[in-house]
Amino acid sequence: MKPIFDINETFEKQLKDLTSNVKSIQDNLLEEIITPNTKTEYLQRFLIDRFDKELFKKNVPIVSYEDIKPYLDRVVNGESSDVISARTITGFLLSSGTSGGAQKMMPWNNKYLDNLTFIYDLRMQVITKHVKGVEEGKGMMFLFTKQESMTPSGLPARVATSSYFKSDYFKNRPSNWYYSYTSPDEVILCPNNTESLYCHLLCGLVQRDEVVRTGSIFASVMVRAIEVLKNSWEELCSNIRSGHLSNWVTDLGCQNSVSLVLGGPRPELADTIEEICNQNSWKGIVKRLWPNTKYIETVVTGSMGQYVPMLNYYCNDLPLVSTTYGSSETTFGINLDPLCKPEDVSYTFMPNMSYFEFIPMDGGDKNDVVDLEDVKLGCTYEPVVTNFAGLYRMRVGDIVLVTGFYNNAPQFKFVRRENVVLSIDSDKTNEEDLFKAVSQAKLVLESSGLDLKDFTSYADTSTFPGHYVVYLEVDTKEGEEKETAQFELDEEALSTCCLVMEESLDNVYKRCRFKDGSIGPLEIRVVRQGTFDSLMDFFISQGASTGQYKTPRCIKSGKALQVLETCVVAKFFSI
């Protein structure tokens, strides 16, 4: 197949070619994927020994991860890749394991990294077009690598970001502004994420005048970095003043590389940073510490949207740029309007990434799956992916809304995860519904001088009737360093939160709750400060990645519930 992307062509022409020829690119891509795979054990049950798009769509079933897991497990345990893929499977990508339960292992090969590198180069061009002067400095990016595991077959299993950072693609990346970071590679590759995060902050502070952008993959990680800064700035200043890294950082790569960045004692710089951090309010702290920062690059769509107010507070309303929509299955596309408001972010799907189909979610026949070029404006769909690593017509589990078109390429807004729900009876509360309800509670908290830091939930069926439990971590409005137990909780406000949350839920919930009596009163359990950091630490200990971590909005793990329950300081009901 002729390459879709010619690095020597202009950016505008590259983008126009991709987005104007969606159908032909998708058809050619599907043929390229399927033709060598018709003899695999999986596909030969459905296809004759040649490519035929109509037969593919008619015979090959739409599947979930559980449907193909037996085939993947065979490769994991040592059988040949051609059980499911004619192209050699060189490893497995781990999902975050926080949205829908246990981690999934997706097959991958270098085609995934080819696509990822393509997207990185494309989004660099997009940002260059929209953000002036961004080429004149470095990025303070909170990027992490997680220790990989090995499958019985000897293939690595790791998260997508680790696969990229440990690859030759990253090692031999272009020497331009977008790949220029304040942190040495050794900090990114450090397997101890606590040490890595501290070193990211230290290197960024030393080079504070060179930073033109900062960020992380997800907004939650950016917020955590700021929280670590709040708790560690005195130690960081001490390191800068002395020119020596703290002894508790034991990773040799970090020790050696960060020492070079420190470059000896810098007492005047330490004094400047200390004066900034010592001020009463941390509003705008990012812009004050890194005055040349032009934008924050991090995902703020979906469940990450709740962190937008906190980032706006700390970053003094710098643009929050959500660049890319991707998953362990594939990279979907990029945001071509990077300076738009977080609530307006849409991603233009790139037709050369994978073969995309869509299950309609607005009623009608869900078997009437449509191609990328046939989606309709204003309709919602679940994407289905066929990729180069052995996934054929696999449901992704996301729900997306068509918001427009760039030439012929559809643009999608991420709406929610399909499989994250609370349910006691006939009620089905998805992540979007829960987020809207919590947003109403957040307004009540703010009127009482409290900020919502994070939340999660679970359906408690140990009582009769069962009821929704929502865990909230709150803080004082100005972010003062106090334990939750040390400032007075407004009992009336929190009881009101229970009521407004119930009022925000749908009619099925209200019928079950107030008419049928099949759901009990909604409960809020307030947890002490630092609880959601502990929850993150738990999931990381179970295999989740620091860089890709998202707070689960519905807890399914009994052990994770124990982490939360040990931190509860108060309970409120909607009675």
From Swiss-Prot:
Keywords in alphabetical order: Coiled coil, Hypersensitive response, Ligase, Plant defense
Coiled coil: 6-33
Induction conditions: By P.syringae pv. maculicola and pv. tomato. Induced by PAD4 locally at the infection site and in a salicylic acid-dependent manner systemically.
pH-activity profile: Optimum pH is 8-8.5.
Residues that coordinate or bind AMP: S95, S96, T301, T324, S328, Y347, D398, R417
Tissue: Expressed in seedlings, mostly in cotyledons, leaves, hypocotyls and sporadically in roots. Not detected in unchallenged adult plants, except in flowers.
UniProt-listed Enzyme Commission number(s): 6.3.2.-
Disruption phenotype: Enhanced susceptibility to virulent and avirulent bacterial pathogens P.syringae pv. tomato and pv. maculicola ES4326 with or without DC3000(avrPphB, avrRpt2, avrB, avrRpm1, or avrRps4) as well as to the oomycete pathogen Hyaloperonospora parasitica (downy mildew) isolates Emoy2, Hind4, Hiks1, Wela3, Cand5, and Wand1. Impaired hyper-sensitive response (HR) and systemic acquired resistance (SAR). Compromised salicylic acid glucosides (SAG) accumulation. Resistance is partially rescued by SA treatment.
Domain of life, source organism: Eukaryota
One Gene Ontology molecular-function label: N-vanillate-L-glutamate synthetase activity
Disulfide feature: none
Binding site residues for salicylate: Y120, D121, L122, R123
Oligomeric form and interacting partners: Interacts with the P.syringae pv. maculicola effector HopW1-1 (via C-terminus).
Protein purpose: Catalyzes the conjugation of specific amino acids (e.g. Glu and possibly His, Lys, and Met) to their preferred acyl substrates (e.g. 4-substituted benzoates), in a magnesium ion- and ATP-dependent manner. Can use 4-substituted benzoates such as 4-aminobenzoate (pABA), 4-fluorobenzoate and 4-hydroxybenzoate (4-HBA), and, to a lesser extent, benzoate, vanillate and trans-cinnamate, but not 2-substituted benzoates and salicylic acid (SA), as conjugating acyl substrates. Involved in both basal and induced resistance in a SA-dependent manner.
Name of the protein this chain belongs to: 4-substituted benzoates-glutamate ligase GH3.12
Organism encoding this protein: Arabidopsis thaliana (Mouse-ear cress)
